[in-house]
Amino acid sequence: ELQLNYYTKSWXRAE
């Protein structure tokens, strides 16, 4: 579940 959190953070930052 931690990986998902990391992905979401990256997405928000990339967008």
UniProtKB/Swiss-Prot annotation:
Cell compartment(s), UniProt:
Secreted, Cell wall
Domain of life according to the entry: Eukaryota
GO terms for cellular component: extracellular region
The protein's UniProt keywords, in alphabetical order, are: Cell wall, Secreted
- Keyword Secreted found: yes
Question: Taking the first listed entry, what is the main subcellular location of this protein, grouped into a coarse class?
Answer: secreted
Q: What is this protein called?
A: 35 kDa cell wall protein
Upper classification of the source organism reads: Eukaryota, Viridiplantae, Streptophyta, Embryophyta, Tracheophyta
